[in-house]
Structure formats: C-alpha cells, structure tokens
Amino acid sequence: MDVEFTPSDTNKFEANITKQHQVIELNNQEEQQQPEQQEQPEQQEELKDNNEKIKTSEDSTTTTTTTATITTTGENSISITVTEANNNTNQLNKSTSSSSSLNNNKNEDNKSVTASIAPSSPVIESSAIESAIDSPYISSASVFSNATNNNNNTTTTNVVVPPPQLLESSTENITSAAEITPVTTTTTEETINIPKESIEVQKQLAETTTTAAITTTNSTQVTSTTVTNPDKLKCKMHRSNFIMTQIGGKKFTEMTLEQLLDEDDPQTGMGFKNPGPQGFLEYVGDTAPPPTPPPISTSNTTGKNTGKNSTTGKSEGKKATSNSSNVPPSPVLASSASPSPKLKSSSSSIRNSGAISGTSENGGGGNGSGTISKNTAPTTGNSTTTTTTTTSTTTSSSKDRKSVVQKQSTLGRLQKNEEERRKRKEQKRSRAREKPILIAGIEDLPAECLKMVKKSKIPEDKLIQHLNILLPILRFRTGYNLRHVPIVSSNNSTNSLGSSINKNNSNNTTTTTTTTNTNNKSPEVSTNSLDVNIINQNQNQTNSVQNNQINTSSNVITTNVIPTTTASQSSQAPYHPSHNGNEEDDYDDGSRLENAILPKGTVDLIETDRDVKKLYKNLKQIGSGGFGSVFLAKSTVDKCEIAIKKIAHVSAKAQRTNLNEIGFLNFCKHPNIVSYLRSHLVDDTIWIAMEYMQGGTLTEASQGHTFNESCIAYVAKGMLEGLMYLHAHNIVHRDIKSGNIMMTIDGKIKIVDFGLCVDANERKLVHMAGSPFWMSPEMIRGESYGCPTDIWSFAICLLELANGEPPHRKSSLTAMFTTATEGCAGLDKPERWTEHFTHFLNLCLEMDPSKRSTAEQLLKHPWINLSENPETMKKILAQIFIANVMNHLDN
C-alpha cells in the first residue's frame, strides 16, 4: 500500500500514545524480527476465522491495527516500518498500545521507537515520521510497500537524516511532530456494538459514493522520492497572505492578526483546531474548498480468501460504511484524557473503504468526511489509563464547490427587458385586432382583467359605478378590445347581460335592439334605434324585427341592448375582420401615436450616406427601455462623448414615431431640453445622436437620496422652464415622468424622450398615451386634453421626490382608477413640508384642467424662490450619480 506523508493535513489528531526510547544493539535487531515473523501465521489463521464469521454475520465490522517502527541506524539514517493488520470481528474491538523504554547506552548509533496503533491509517498516526520527513536537514525519503498476506500489510520507509546530536539540536522541527519523553505504558480498548439499522443506512450511503475504488493486487511495491521545502510548515505565513490578498484584510472577529494566526491558544486562532492552510479555509467558512484532483488508486494486499471482501465495487463500499457509527460527517477533534505530552499530529482527512486509502479526495485538505469519535473510561490499575479512540472514515464524495450565482451583465439584462417589453406589446396589438368583447358587468371581464381588478383591491361598488372608466384603463393595460354595453330590458329595468344570456336555453330565441350614442359627453340613451337580427339557434333562421318589438312567445326572450360610448370610444374605428392596418393604435399602451397626427419630422433629417463606424467609436450600452437602447460613444465629428439612441425602424408605426421624435428634437432648442445632433439610418435601425449627460434620471435620484424642499424646488424650476418653452409652441410632451427627466452632475435638469410629443394645434387630443402613474385625470377619462396634462405629470414627479415613489406605486390599475375618479392624495406626510410647497402642488393637481396653473404661472410662485444654490446642487447631484458615471467609464 502507498503511504503519503504531507505536512498540510487538515485535521489535528491528538494521539494518546506515550513514547519511550529503547536502545537496542544492531546484533539483536534480527532476533526481534524473527518472533514477529513466527507470529504472522498465527495471525493469518485468526484472520481467516474472523473472515468466516464476517460472511455469516450482518453486524460484522472491520478493525485495523497499524504498527509503526522507527529505527535510527548509523549516524545519518532512520528506518521506519509501518505494519497494518485488518481483523474482522462481529464487534468493533479497538486496542491501542504503546510501549517503549529509554536506556542510556554508550552506543548512540542505534535507536528504535515502536508504536502499535489501532485502528487508523499510517498517515494519521505517524506524525513523528512526517516531522522527520519535513525536517530541513532531510534531502529525500523513499517509501516501500511490501505485501505480506491477505490482511497484513507492512510499509517500510527509509529516510536519510543528520546525526542524532544535530537532530536533537533542531528542536523546532522535532517538537512540531513529537516530544519524546520517557513515560509509562498505555493500553486503550473499546467495544462498540453497531445496530443493524445503522449498517443498512451506511450500506446505502456507500452505494452512492463516488470514492475511487482501491486497486487490489497480490503484491505491490511502490517507491517514490519526495523533496521537501523548509517553508513547508510555515502555515502562519500562508494564512497571513490569504487574509491580506484574498479577503482584503477582512477579519471575522475582533481579534488581532497575531491572535488569528495563533495555532496554540484554544480560545483564539484560525489554525488551532485544524492547523495548516486548510485550517483557516475552514475558519472563514464561506471560502470554497480547493479543486478536487483526480483520484489516486492505492495498492492493497488481498489474497484468494478475500474474494468476497474485495475493496472494489459495492461490496467495498458496504464494508467501509460499517466502520462509521452515527456521527456527523464533518471532522471532530478527539482530545486526549491522558496528562502525558501529546504527539502533535497533522494529518489528511483520508477516505477509507475497508482498507486504507492513501490520498484525500480534497487533495490533502478541505473538509473531508472522515470522523473521529472518542469515548474515555478510566480503569483501575497501577499506572494504566484506558482510553478509546475510534477513527472512522466514511466513503462519500467530497462536497462540490459552492455554485456562485453570477449577476447578469448590464447588457444582457437590458436586452432581456427589451425583449420582454417587445413581447408584451405584440400581445397587446394582437388582442386589439380581435373582435370586441362586450362588457355589461364585472363578471364579463377576461380572466387577466379580473385578476388585475382583484389585485387592485378597489371596492366593487366603485368599480360598478365607474365601469365606463375602468374599461379604457383595462384596455390600455392589457390590450383587450373591451366595449361597455349597458343593458336595458323591455320593461325599462336594467338587467345583467350575463344573466340574460344564461337564462336562455337551446330552444330560446334572443331579440336584441342596439342603439349608438354619438354624443361624446352625454351618456344618455339615443332614441334612434337600429334594426337587429333575430337569431334562432336551432333553426338558423333570421328575421327582421323593429326596435322595441316584444316577442310574446313563451320560448323567446326579447332584450334591448343599448351601448353608450364615451369620448375615448368614439374615436375608435369599428371592428372589421380585414382591418389589420392601424386598429392597434386605438388600443395602445401609450407608445404609439394616432394615425391622424402627422409626424413632426421628415426623412430629410435622416442621414443615410455617412459611415457610422467612422463617425462613432467605442460604443457601450448604458440604458434601455420601451423607446430602444442608449449607447455611449466617442464622436470623431463632435470631438466629445455623445449618446446614441437606437430604435427599430421597420413598421409604419415605428417609422412614424421615429420621425416624430426626430422632428421635435430638431425643432426644440432650449437649455432644459436635450440637445439633438443628427440621425442615421443603419440597416433597419435609426440612430439618434444626442448630447451625453453625465448623471442619471430623476427616478434614480429619488430612490437613492432624500431631497429637501430647496432641492425639489431646484428640480421643479428646471422642469418648468423646459415645459414653458414647449407649451409656448403648443407642444404637449404627454410622457413627462421621472424616467424622462435627466439630472447631470453639472446641476442641469433636462427633458428627454420626445417620441409621444404632439402639436396641440393639429386636432383635439383624446388618445390615452404616456405612463400610468403620471397620467392626468382627463386623459384617463378619455376627455380632451392639452398642455395642462403635462403640468399634472410634472407634479407627480415632485411627489416622487418628496415621498420616494409616485402615488399607488404597487398597482397601475389602482393609480389610474383613483386618479380618474378621486384625483391625487398629495404628500404622504404633509406636516414635514411647508405650506408653500403644499399650495404649489395643489395648483398643479387640480382635477379640472382649465383651473390648473400653467408653467409660466408656477415659475412665479413664491415656493420656487426657495430653490437651492446651483453650486450646492452640483455637489449633491455629483454625489448621487458618481457611481453611474464610474460604471459607464468601467463598462
């Protein structure tokens, strides 16, 4: 078998073995070996009997006895002999004995130390050998494995060392492995009864392990040479380097660095329980173990009689687990009850499978599955102390390295969000082209709409009362083509459409009279009615019936269905199966324009002949949204960094929207509006080049900083100056929100994203557009709107700075429904703010748009005079957005 001696072992085993030195003459050495050879046949017979018992007993276990003999010969050599015996019995009997004597003889050339250890591996219990090998005076070591019989293994290691006088003078290396003192003989015995149920569980565990099977051969001899380094045992240095380089000097306790690196104090120190580099890896806890090296098979001597007890395959795994009692799989330090000096042992966590495995799966370190349990029981005697030490190692695979979940890159996350947004839009467009869904009550809503209504927690009585407001909101959010259809029965009583239909059976005929209300403001029913069809479901016959005609047949139910249309519905084109053109624009989420509104820009503003690769260098994506993606680039023309907005330019709708934005950007020239440079058509994408503003959006600022009134007034002043410019030219932005307000580290406030801009002079605006939380009541209700709708949205932005988020942020349906029916509640904590601020907000949040203050009037309000100093605001904004700027530079 191969024996590996390494100083970087993970577990520190305190062996309760007393040591004595006995000087033996070279002439008597051969005489001592002869009795040992005569005892071997007796041991073989005994082992055969034990193997026979194992075959017939389910509770059989394995006992391993290892004898290590260290002999010093001559002036510069040490002979180390390790003998291991595996004995199978019905009970796990462990016996540890160690005896030695020290005779001061004139002949100092011959020294021998003999230790009998059970059960353990030579690697674990031979710290003295390890220390000798690790000595800086040792140049090489040779390991020989000689197989003797089926269950008796002998390992001899020859090491070249300096003279004893020089070896004794090197106390640092010697004491690190063993302190040799004359002590009394110690005998250790223990008997453990393993339950049958425990063996079954351990057998199942062994079958699932991935430990490499140990190669079995009749006789194997392996010779290796190891060259050690004097710095091999300097674990303190390794731990210190790890703390400073790998975890940035971070300490997990209040202890000093010297205390952390201490290996002797049981109260402190990273390496006390487990010395060596692996000790502090276990100490820090969250550090992953080192990579698992390829498993190394070891030679084990087996004969013909061990065919059924082979150490390979399932049988080997089952035998291995029989040695492990019900103990945790992590290493447990076994302390000694003996007051005698301890043998300082640093050993690997070895995974044994019936026989001794020479190499740890963790590569000589890490948290192995080996366990050491201890039971101590004092016995009466002259000078004998009985101690039981059990070394049990289970055959289980090493724990995999913790999977580190890496965050998605900014580019990947933005692309994913953009793809999801595109899919939602396509779904809404598809729903808008479907046949209208007639809604007479809440129960008629599609499942998705019902889910949104339930989540909003709006009282049902309010939903029923304002159903004509609820349906446009649901259509805006989901894309469903919902039509409000109030029901009026023949006796002038209102019935539910759903209940009327449910009353009809297969033999009934329904007569429906439909009227259309052309008045956009009045919900009253028109007296003009239309001819309707009487559909007989059984006979498929169609008859013409005049309005308000009542069929007196007992099998026929006649109902007058009179839908009333609101202003928002009056602008909708009637449904037709072949209408696939621009129907989708009437059931939009706010990202598209009405067909009747002509785009502000023309194709002459788009450059197609210039090579963008030469104009712009080092493009880096820094943002994404429903509008497209934004990139930071170096402009060779402008000699500065610019922002490039990329938008798809394929469909007619996209082309119209892009031309509209380019036209308004090209037209608007104001310090509080983003500066436009130029546009390019690249394949099927429009590139809009604009000034790059170092900073972030108002949304980011409100989430990461608490603004006082003076800072809010500063932002309000900049926004109002930009809005006053737009409104002076009858331009309605329609998408004023915190995400479209840029705040730079230079203290500038600028309005961006002009894709939904429209000229109010062209026609009366009734189309719902924009973002739900910032929409004005008149837009949600489907009434005509104009520049005052931007003032409402502007006030919501100020509330977002004051409250930290817009009103009703958890539900867009609740926000829109409450805004349309009740208005805005205002500040969350009015007592924290001045009366001037509250009055300013009230002027902006008037439900009646005609009473709402204009941007020019608001700029004259006394509250605006509280605006923060520009130099102070620069420092505040630079502090808020410095992380964004650095992130853009690093990407």
Swiss-Prot record:
Region (Disordered), start-end ranges: 24-70, 85-121, 264-435, 495-526, 565-588
Biased composition (Basic and acidic residues): 45-58
EC id: 2.7.11.1
Source organism superkingdom: Eukaryota
Family annotation (CDD domains): PKc_STE (cd05122)
Composition bias, Low complexity: 29-41, 61-70, 86-105, 297-314, 322-360, 379-397, 495-522
The keyword Nucleotide-binding appears for this protein: yes
SMART domains from the UniProt entry: S_TKc
Molecular-function GO term, any one: metal ion binding
Compositionally biased residues, Basic residues: 422-432
Pfam families cross-referenced by the UniProt entry: Pkinase
Entry annotated with the keyword Ribosomal protein: no
Active site residues of this protein: D735 (proton acceptor)
GO cellular component, one term: cytoplasm
Necessary cofactors: Mg(2+)
PANTHER family per record: SERINE/THREONINE-PROTEIN KINASE SAMKA-RELATED-RELATED, SERINE_THREONINE-PROTEIN KINASE SAMKA-RELATED
Name used for this protein in its record: Probable serine/threonine-protein kinase mkcC
Higher taxonomy: Eukaryota, Amoebozoa, Evosea, Eumycetozoa, Dictyostelia
Gene of this entry: mkcC
